[in-house]
Amino acid sequence: MRNILLTIEYDGTNYFGWQKQPNKKTVQGVIEDAIKKITGEDVNLVGSGRTDRGVHALGQKANFKTESKIPTEKFPLALNSVLPNDISIKDAAEVSLDFSARYSAKQKTYKYLIYNHKFRPAILCNYVYHFPYELDLVSMQKSCEYFIGEYDFSSFCSSGSETNSKVRRIFDCYLTFENDCIAIYITANGFLYNMARIIAGTILDVGVGRFKPTDIPLIIESKDRTKAGKTLPPWGLYLVDVVY
């Protein structure tokens, strides 16, 4: 028995999120089907986290147990030969049998892309959030700094969260520019339900003057979802990396 860790890139546009669901096309389900095609095994693919419908990944991690004799380094090519073009296995590594892509994760990084131009994009419509109004980028960057630290992030969690504790540690949060877009990067030891999208929405609200950067600690302290910004759409969000 071996435990194989995959690094996965996918376009989430045509999927009902990561997690397998009855009668719905999901990333987990499609990859499990691909593994069965090349190994003949029914496996349980454990992802580092469940991305929602429309969310993309550049570096999702997932592991599965196998009795297959396929060399570890051959798994990416073998799987990619039977996977659709919007899912790609970038790497495979053998890990200890007690390793879990979900529970062994130390930190994750997400980014949110905002297309801040007058006219909406056509080609990028499923990959960025279009926001045509002027933004105060200096204040947005300043607001990012107030998220860094360990706090109860109840204000940045949608209802329906399955976790009891809302305490998370954000290691880094900053603004940069990528391919004509504003990119908000957030690295944390874990994320609550919609946490990254709500933080991005709150930072955007700072950019239009609804909040001041110094309001962020007050919003965190309130532990009240209604005090924070809106939840931005899923298609601008990317799971960038997972560290173990």
From Swiss-Prot:
GO terms for biological process: tRNA pseudouridine synthesis. Keywords: Isomerase, tRNA processing. It catalyses: uridine(38/39/40) in tRNA = pseudouridine(38/39/40) in tRNA. PANTHER family: PSEUDOURIDYLATE SYNTHASE (PTHR11142), TRNA PSEUDOURIDINE SYNTHASE-LIKE 1 (PTHR11142:SF0). It comes from Caldicellulosiruptor saccharolyticus (strain ATCC 43494 / DSM 8903 / Tp8T 6331). Substrate binds at Y110. Belongs to the tRNA pseudouridine synthase TruA family. The active site is at D52 (nucleophile). InterPro entries: PsdUridine_synth_cat_dom_sf, PsdUridine_synth_TruA, PsdUridine_synth_TruA_a/b_dom, PsdUridine_synth_TruA_C, TruA/RsuA/RluB/E/F_N. Formation of pseudouridine at positions 38, 39 and 40 in the anticodon stem and loop of transfer RNAs. Homodimer. One of its GO terms (molecular function) is RNA binding. Its EC number is 5.4.99.12. It is an enzyme of class 5 (isomerase). This is tRNA pseudouridine synthase A. It comes from the Bacteria. The gene is truA. SUPFAM superfamilies: Pseudouridine synthase.
